[in-house]
Amino acid sequence: ENIDYDFYGFQNKEPIWGNDFYQALNNSKMGLNLSRGLPTKYYTSNRIASLMGNGLLTFVDKKTQLDDMFNSHEVIMYNNVNDLTDKINFYKKNDNLRKRIASAGRKKYFKLFNELNIAKYILDKSLGKKATLY
């Protein structure tokens, strides 16, 4: 099945910034959180904040182990390109489920990474205290 997608800043498609970026998010239902290089435990580009914060169903490579923070009712983990394709096609056909998971993911993201939690984490790290986010 065909998947409509845009990859900005890739293969001669200019990157988009500012309002154009947020307009593209607003016109999207799902987002792929790709990071440069090989997947690394808990590493993600800041793109995840834009995707999840704007309520998009977000797909993340399982090798990042972000499923330690988010469950399958909040983010969609994929194992490889074929798995990703199957999952995108599934959620394309299951809009209510897509919306529920995206909404739960947005809520969880804001719970984990709000300004108070981040400030406390930075202060605890700076003062040599045990620091955790989740």
Regions found by a protein language model. Name each.
Residues 20, 83-86:
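Short acidic active-site motifs
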Residues 81-84, 105:
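Catalytic phosphate/metal-binding cores of nucleic-acid and nucleotide-processing enzymes, i.e., regions
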Residues 70, 88, 102:
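Short, flexible helix/strand-to-coil boundary loops that buttress conserved ligand/catalytic motifs
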Residues 1-73, 77, 129:
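Nucleotide-sugar donor-binding catalytic core of glycosyltransferases
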Residues 124-134:
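C-terminal accessory extensions appended to soluble enzyme cores
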Residues 92-125:
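A charged, aromatic-enriched C-terminal amphipathic alpha-helix characteristic of glycosyltransferases
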Residues 75-81, 91-95:
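Conserved acidic donor-binding segment of nucleotide-sugar-dependent glycosyltransferases
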